[in-house]
Amino acid sequence: MADKKPAADNWPVVSGDYIVGDPESPVAVTTLASHNEDIPAAAGAAIAGPCKTENLGIEKVVANIISNPNIRFLILCGAEVQGHITGQSIQALHENGCDPEKKKITGATGAIPFVENIPMEGVERFQQQVELVDLIDNEDGGAITAKVKECIEKDPGAFEEDAMVIEVKEGDDDEDEGEEIRPISAETALLEARIRNIDTQVKLVGAVQRNMAGNYSGKVQGIMIGLIFTLVIGFLLLMAPLLGA
């Protein structure tokens, strides 16, 4: 049997919308924008729940994972969160970490991918402790259940270090720390992305129209020059007999 260690007192240490199972299970599951957390929980996950924002949401996931050294796998499943792109942001944090000063997740494509409440040692612990399993955009209950059970069978045992507890501040208690980064809803972020896309398309159409207008002007000029040239040649041909006489 794999070696186990105690999780932090009162684990999970951060509140959230999740189902808690056996704290000695090696598997944590985030269902991203989907609400089918009952499936991985029933399959034996230690904790399972949605994660909809690429800042506070990810901070909570990381805090609850590193405070339980028994968790060695994090399965990302369910629908990706539009606008926030939370699943990809978690992958980027695990692979690339974050800027040590700005705390922006390196390589994340979400709207506001900042993990200000996670110290660098917490980020490194997250990277070292768990293996990510990518089932993003997969809501199939059978596939999720099978993957949870597969990870349980591969349990390497508890992480070598004890539980790490960090505080995740949900309020804005430190206004002097700098400009607050306010989470936005997935719908708002998606709307902004679509507006930017429309603006780009409008600019592209304008460029095409200008190009077509330039081509049209060039064609008109060519026709006029050809017409004038034809008239001049015709005039000279008509005048040739008279000049010869």
Swiss-Prot record:
Q: Which residues lie on this side of the membrane: Cytoplasmic?
A: 1-222
Q: Which InterPro entries match?
A: MeTrfase_MtrA/MtxA, MtrA
**Pfam families tied to this protein:** MtrA (PF04208)
Which reaction does this enzyme catalyse, per its entry? 5-methyl-5,6,7,8-tetrahydromethanopterin + coenzyme M + 2 Na(+)(in) = 5,6,7,8-tetrahydromethanopterin + methyl-coenzyme M + 2 Na(+)(out)
Q: What class of enzyme is it?
A: translocase
Bilayer disposition of the protein: Single-pass membrane protein
Residues that, per the record, bind 5-hydroxybenzimidazolylcob(I)amide: H84
Sorted alphabetically, the keyword list is: Cell membrane, Cobalt, Membrane, Methanogenesis, Methyltransferase, One-carbon metabolism, Transferase, Translocase, Transmembrane, Transmembrane helix
Q: How is the cofactor bound?
A: Binds 1 5-hydroxybenzimidazolylcobamide group.
The places in or outside the cell where this protein is found are:
Cell membrane
Membrane is among the record's keywords: yes
Residue ranges of the TM segments: 223-243
Q: To which protein family does this belong? A: Belongs to the MtrA family.
Q: What do we know about how this protein assembles, alone or with others? A: The complex is composed of 8 subunits; MtrA, MtrB, MtrC, MtrD, MtrE, MtrF, MtrG and MtrH.
Name of the featured protein: Tetrahydromethanopterin S-methyltransferase subunit A 1
From which organism does this entry originate?
Methanobrevibacter ruminantium (strain ATCC 35063 / DSM 1093 / JCM 13430 / OCM 146 / M1) (Methanobacterium ruminantium)
Gene symbol? mtrA1
